[in-house]
């Protein structure tokens, strides 16, 4: 499991306004952590587009448009992750790093 891979993840059970169900997520934790820990930090993807939200990053996955929900960042057990769907482009990864830094600091 590598940083910026997109994988299926089972997010249930969820609580309150947390994103739920099985959906794609982007791994955002560092590869050194991904290799050593039993958990990964991810941002879920959603097809519910909100172009004006500064907490979301628009990406194209296959033929569909989606948004990476940086406001829904969370740590999951690796056992919740399924097959790899793809990876972010270098430009998308750079934009995601910038947005995470804007939201959560350096």
Predicted feature descriptions by range:
Residues 1-106:
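Conserved functional hotspots at enzyme active or ligand-binding sites that engage polyanionic ligands
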């Amino acid at each position: 499991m590598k940083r910026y891979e997109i994988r299926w993840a089972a997010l249930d059970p969820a609580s309150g306004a947390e994103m739920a169900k099985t959906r794609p997520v982007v791994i955002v934790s560092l590869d050194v952590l991904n290799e050593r820990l039993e958990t990964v930090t991810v941002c879920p993807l959603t097809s519910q587009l909100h172009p004006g939200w500064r907490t979301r990053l628009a990406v194209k996955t296959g033929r569909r448009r989606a948004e990476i929900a940086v406001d829904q960042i969370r740590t999951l057990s690796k056992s919740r992750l399924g097959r790899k769907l793809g990876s972010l482009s270098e430009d998308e990864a750079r934009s995601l790093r910038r947005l995470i830094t804007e939201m959560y600091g350096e």
